[in-house]
Curated annotation (Swiss-Prot):
It comes from Methylocella silvestris (strain DSM 15510 / CIP 108128 / LMG 27833 / NCIMB 13906 / BL2). This is Large ribosomal subunit protein bL19. The keyword Ribonucleoprotein applies. InterPro entries: Ribosomal_bL19, Ribosomal_bL19_CS, Ribosomal_bL19_sf, Translation_prot_SH3-like_sf. GO terms for cellular component: cytosolic large ribosomal subunit.
């Protein structure tokens, strides 16, 4: 691994510090909880929409989320390692055949829908078993501290 890649990995680990970024791709519907500063206080605002693109790599990686707000299309670009992002949650997986879904900008209503990627029962069972196992391990590790 070259020096720049090592430094980027180190910085990414420092920026994440306890946060986990789920695996998501264009076509997935995500909820991004963003920290918004209003005067003295800070609050968390949820922004839900379809991820239409992922750009860059390493620390500069970003993604674009599009939603329809009061009949008007709104797009917002987020840096993955931004300290302003509180959390990212994947609501549903989309089945698409493109990396950039910019064609959704021209579509309205039913033509802008994205088919949901269905998970096989076996894959779902293994995912849930891993989730339970991780939860149990976390629960067992907590009293030891």
């Amino acid at each position: 691994m070259n020096i720049i890649a090592e430094l980027e990995a180190e910085q990414a680990a420092k920026l994440l510090a306890g946060k986990t970024i789920p695996e998501f791709q264009p076509g997935d519907t995500v909820i991004v909880n963003v920290k918004v500063k209003e005067g003295e206080r800070t609050r968390v605002q949820a922004y839900e929409g379809v991820c239409i693109a992922r750009n860059g790599g390493g620390l500069n990686e970003s993604f674009t989320v599009r939603k329809i707000s009061y009949g008007e299309g709104v797009e917002r670009v987020f840096a993955i390692y931004s300290p302003n992002i509180d959390s990212i949650k994947v609501v549903r997986r989309g089945k698409v055949r493109r990396a950039k879904l910019y064609y959704l900008r021209d579509r309205r209503g039913k033509s802008a829908r994205i088919a949901e990627k269905m998970e096989s029962p076996a894959a779902k069972a293994t995912r849930e078993a891993a989730k339970k196992e991780a939860k149990a391990a976390k629960k067992n590790a907590a009293p030891a501290e």
